Amino acid sequence: MARLAGVDLPREKRMEVALTYIFGIGPARSKELLEKTGISPDLRSKDLTDEQLSALRDVIENTWKVEGDLRREIQADIRRKIEIGSYQGLRHRRGLPVRGQRTKTNARTRKGPKKTIAGKKK
């Protein structure tokens, strides 16, 4: 099983898809990575040679932040917004949508399950 950036890549998937299992690498970045290393997108991850794996590893480590580093950076950005008291930080602190979505209805994912108000009768 091929292992890149601390993630086990699925053996039977095409490399173009398998690379997207790494946090921080989506479809576009996956294609770009395969072009840089000269690996066919149709190749299965089980068929990768050690040289190809090391080439992928080098490009990923030297070009982008992925997995743990990226997650830590995102969390640090959120903490910074909360500390400086920005509007976005306030929304994060209150557990509400940050990017201007409506909250009168919807936003249940962010707000959690409904809190029933006692004594409200029809």
From Swiss-Prot:
One of its GO terms (molecular function) is structural constituent of ribosome. Keywords: Ribonucleoprotein, Ribosomal protein, RNA-binding, rRNA-binding, tRNA-binding. SUPFAM superfamilies: S13-like H2TH domain. Residues 93-122 are annotated as: Disordered. GO terms for biological process: translation. Transmembrane segments: none annotated. Located at the top of the head of the 30S subunit, it contacts several helices of the 16S rRNA. In the 70S ribosome it contacts the 23S rRNA (bridge B1a) and protein L5 of the 50S subunit (bridge B1b), connecting the 2 subunits; these bridges are implicated in subunit movement. Contacts the tRNAs in the A and P-sites. Part of the 30S ribosomal subunit. Forms a loose heterodimer with protein S19. Forms two bridges to the 50S subunit in the 70S ribosome. This is Small ribosomal subunit protein uS13. It comes from Corynebacterium jeikeium (strain K411).
